[in-house]
């Protein structure tokens, strides 16, 4: 079983960008958490992808069709703006979990809208990087049904 973890803009700057909100761990640590959590859940492979470009994220979702069993996605800023990412998730119809490091629901008004959420069966917010481990756990439970 294969999982794909997709990270949007600025997540490559973890540990540098607003550590009071996103923590002090860097992106390499996030990748490590995803790989370890995926293995613990019984995934044969966890691919972790990051891009600052909306089209690259859409391309990656489309390329996943027929190749991955589930997606964990943190669209980051594109959460609140990207119908293209929503449409790509709907097009491939791969089970997906939305994850956010911070509790976006307690932040600025513009962060209250999530287009990606409309194509996801669950959303995890405010658990820091461990939210990815939780998302992979939910994904595995969903796939095992």
What are these regions (language model features)?
Residues 14-28:
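Glycine- and acidic-residue-enriched helix-capping/strand-helix junction motifs
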Residues 64-71:
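Short acidic/histidine-rich motifs immediately flanking catalytic phosphotransfer sites
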Residues 47-55:
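Short beta->alpha junction loops
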Residues 9-11, 76-79, 102-104:
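Short glycine-rich anion-binding loops that position phosphate/pyrophosphate groups of nucleotides
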């Amino acid at each position: 079983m294969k999982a794909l973890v997709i990270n949007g803009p600025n997540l490559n700057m973890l540990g540098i960008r607003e550590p009071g909100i996103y923590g002090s761990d860097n992106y390499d640590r996030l990748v490590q958490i995803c790989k370890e959590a995926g293995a613990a859940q019984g995934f044969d492979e966890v691919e972790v992808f990051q891009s600052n470009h909306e089209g690259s994220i859409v391309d990656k979702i489309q390329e996943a069709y027929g190749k991955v069993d589930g997606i964990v996605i943190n669209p980051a800023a594109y959460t609140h703006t990207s119908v293209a990412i929503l449409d790509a998730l709907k097009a491939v119809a791969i089970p997906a979990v939305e994850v956010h490091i911070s509790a976006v629901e307690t932040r600025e008004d513009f962060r209250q809208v999530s287009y990606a959420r409309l194509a996801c069966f669950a959303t995890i917010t405010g658990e820091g990087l461990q939210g990815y481990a939780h998302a992979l756990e939910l994904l595995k439970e969903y796939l095992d049904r």
